[in-house]
């Protein structure tokens, strides 16, 4: 009889523990953070899971930004979307127009969490804010601006001041020639050429990229990056390329690897590349602001953000959304947002995270770590330098890559390439405009 009682009690306890295990709400989080960045994403998720045993954030690397966005949309159509999808900034208009999302402000409201949207840096939050409601549609996460990384040891060898990176594109062209003369095979390379050499070149020099304030004022915007200033800039890079001073090594982050391997003396890349550079560079390096065009009056203006935000997908259970809200709230806590900023090089997305980082003395100990923030806040943004909100922008970036590659291979002049990119890109904008009105 006692044995039967023990058996029954053991069975009851087993079922109870099984019930507790089954009660854990699993929350898939698809992202594009690899290398050191991916490790930090995993670390944040693990700490949240330990503090919130009823929920389990499961980060899944789904490839680069384009691949992750495509995978997320395809999964939504089949009813298998993750709860959280990281989408890069140029996918914002696409996500806004889709019926696949649940706005983050609604997620917090439904979860009963009093979430202060004003804590986010305004120039970052504005990129992801709905103009009609004034609320965030997605939560800023890994926001960045392009910065200039340079090899201080190579500078010394070339007779250049290692504490003075080039401030203008004209200076950069001069520096690359000297670096090459001193033995560097690659003086300068650039990743993400559309984002850096056209989108941010335009904003940093106070030029529009598209009409309608870069699309923020309507879907009937047209591209405008084939103006004399942009053409002149691409012509400068073309001339450097012909001399061997500028090396085109790929559309994404390939130039960062070329830099930290010591092959290229300088590169313009995301501030978020700092984590990998810090890990792999075996030489002294520095961080400088993006160069500006010395011939453009009023430059530099302000940088526009890159990186990505976190979107919440439709069609999930209430308990899943509660867990998502708690996780997003966790990410925005000053200590967590500050740690993410310090370990990765991405911008501090909240004012409190920036202040905490400053109080901790991080910027004093790590000169250049605040470059991305200083660029973004260099001057109050003009209506057409606060960012981009253009439909089909990922595909437009591909077009820009194709056309710029035709310049580097000598098949087109800078004017021909940018004219064609604008023409092809405008066709995609008209398709998006038509679809958004249907």
From Swiss-Prot:
Annotated keywords: Periplasm, Signal, Transport
Top-level taxon in the UniProt lineage: Bacteria
Family matches, as Pfam families: SBP_bac_8 (PF13416)
Signal peptide limits: 1-23
Gene3D superfamilies: Periplasmic binding protein-like II
Gene Ontology CC terms: outer membrane-bounded periplasmic space
Compartments, as annotated in UniProt: Periplasm
Swiss-Prot/TrEMBL GO biological process terms: transmembrane transport
CDD domains named among the record's database cross-references: PBP2_UgpB
Residues the record lists as binding sn-glycerol 3-phosphate: 65, 89, 144, 270, 307, 346, 397
Biological role: Part of the ABC transporter complex UgpBAEC involved in sn-glycerol-3-phosphate (G3P) import. Binds G3P.
Similarity field: Belongs to the bacterial solute-binding protein 1 family.
Self-association and partners: The complex is composed of two ATP-binding proteins (UgpC), two transmembrane proteins (UgpA and UgpE) and a solute-binding protein (UgpB).
Name of the protein described by the UniProt record: sn-glycerol-3-phosphate-binding periplasmic protein UgpB
């Amino acid at each position: 009889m006692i044995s039967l009682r023990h058996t029954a009690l053991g069975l009851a306890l087993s079922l109870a523990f099984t019930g507790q295990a089954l009660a854990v709400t699993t929350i898939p989080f698809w992202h594009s953070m690899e290398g050191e960045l991916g490790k930090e994403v995993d670390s944040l998720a693990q700490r949240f899971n330990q503090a919130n045993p009823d929920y389990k954030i499961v980060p899944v690397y789904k490839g680069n930004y384009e691949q992750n966005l495509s995978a997320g949309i395809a999964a939504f159509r089949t009813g298998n979307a993750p709860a959280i999808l990281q989408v890069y900034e140029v996918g914002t208009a696409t996500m806004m127009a889709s019926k696949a999302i649940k706005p983050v402000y609604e997620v917090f409201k439904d979860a009963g969490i009093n979430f202060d949207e004003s804590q986010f840096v305004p120039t970052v939050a504005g990129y992801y804010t709905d103009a009609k409601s004034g609320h965030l549609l997605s939560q800023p996460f890994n926001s960045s601006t392009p910065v200039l990384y340079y090899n201080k040891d190579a500078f010394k060898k070339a007779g250049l001041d290692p504490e003075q990176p080039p401030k203008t594109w004209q200076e950069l062209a001069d520096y690359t020639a000297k670096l090459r003369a001193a033995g560097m095979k690659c003086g300068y390379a650039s990743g993400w050429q559309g984002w850096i050499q056209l989108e941010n070149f335009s904003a940093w020099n106070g030029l529009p990229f598209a009409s309608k304030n870069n699309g923020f004022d309507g879907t009937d915007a047209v591209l405008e990056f084939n103006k004399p200033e942009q053409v002149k800039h691409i012509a400068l890079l073309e001339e450097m390329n012909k001399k061997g001073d500028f090396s085109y090594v790929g559309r994404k982050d390939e130039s960062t690897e070329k830099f930290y391997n010591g092959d290229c003396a300088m590169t313009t890349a995301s501030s978020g590349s700092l984590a990998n550079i810090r890990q792999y560079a075996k030489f002294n390096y520095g961080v400088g602001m993006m160069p500006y065009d010395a011939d453009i009056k009023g430059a530099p203006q302000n940088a526009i953000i890159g990186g990505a935000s976190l979107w919440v997908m439709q069609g999930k259970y209430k308990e899943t959304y509660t867990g998502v809200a708690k996780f997003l709230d966790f990410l925005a806590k000053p200590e967590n947002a500050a740690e993410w900023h310090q370990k990765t090089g991405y911008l501090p997305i909240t004012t409190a995270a920036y202040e905490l980082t400053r109080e901790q003395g991080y910027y004093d100990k790590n000169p250049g770590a605040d470059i991305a923030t200083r660029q973004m806040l260099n001057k109050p943004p003009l209506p057409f330098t606060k960012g981009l909100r253009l439909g089909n922008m990922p595909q437009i970036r591909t077009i820009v890559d194709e056309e710029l590659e035709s310049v580097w291979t000598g098949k087109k002049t800078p004017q021909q390439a940018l004219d064609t990119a604008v023409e092809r890109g405008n066709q995609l904008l008209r398709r998006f405009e038509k679809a958004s009105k249907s």
